[in-house]
Amino acid sequence: GGVDLVNGADVRLVPDHIAGRGTSDASTISVEYPSLLTDLLAGDLVVLGDGAISLSVDSVDEHAVHCRVRTGGRVQGRPGVHIPSERLRLSTPTDEDLVLGRAMAEAGADFLAVSFVRSAHDLRVMREAVAPLQVRLVAKVETMSAIAGLDEIIAEADAVMVARGDLGIECPLEDVPHLQKRIVRQCVEAGVPVITATQMMESMIVSPSPTRAEVSDIANAVFDGTDALMLSAETAVGADPVAVVRTMNRIAGRAETEANYRQWGARLGRVQRGRWPRSEEHTSELPVTFLYLVCRLLLEKK
């Protein structure tokens, strides 16, 4: 399945309440965002998903955002549409997020990953919605607003996710590695578990083995001190999800044998004991724990 967008073609972005949910084709993409027509302007660059497809906005009317395809590709399902965070009028989390979050907590979810967190206030709102249930909240850091308020977000979150996909759209790509390391380091210093996510093994959606660059990416995340590595499309729509998990397990495990956590912790100097109980052996060695399915249910914006 999917829709192919060709370079130079005209395409309309239409809110769900006008187009109807899930009615996308090569000329119209249905978007789950009610304020779409007011938050985009002529001249804007719009990217779909994690940035592989880009559109330029020609005009906006009362029914649709009219775009031209700059970089084409295949649109699968209902792709996320990136809108600059400083222009978002939609409150986060949305009312729908709060309802779904409560339902997931009541269903027994261990974690909720809260998307597009812009401040610690967003986490407090979600925490109030799921109270008194003790579900843990994962703050997805994927906007520059979140980077600006990182200290407060880390203090409020039960765990933090380095969501490199949308973060790499919000900022220049060359900044992503530095921001990733900064987020991981600050989480380690605060004793808050941190997850590194997005395109860890993207090639294995179709390939039986990862690229050398992906192998290095996983190992370097381990060496930086990440507590978890998360798979997304590789296991959601990939050809062989089990092989992906086994391969990541092997790479991450090998990296751990090379990491001197005692020396690494001494260099870091300010590592606090984590909020989650660990054994004395684990606390002294500062090991990395790899969670391939970080939570049973993720609260995602699709």
Residue ranges and their predicted role:
Residues R89, V138, E189, M248-E280:
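Long, charged amphipathic helices and adjacent flexible linkers at domain junctions
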Residues G1-G101:
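Beta-strand/loop-dominated core regions that host nucleotide or nucleotide-derived cofactor-binding catalytic loops
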Residues E281-K302:
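Single conserved hydrophobic/aromatic residue that forms the stacking wall/gate
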Residues A213, D217-L268:
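Active-site or pore-adjacent capping/gating segments
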Residues Q76-R87, A105-A109, M161-D166, E256-R270:
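Gly-rich Lys/Arg/Thr-decorated short loops/hinges at beta-loop-alpha junctions or inter-strand turns
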Residues Q76-G77, L133-G149, R246-A255, A259:
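Conserved anion-binding
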Residues L13-P15, V47-G49, C67, V114, ...:
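General beta-strand structural signal in soluble alpha/beta enzymes
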Residues R89-T198, M204-V215, A219-V222, A236:
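Conserved alpha/beta-domain cores
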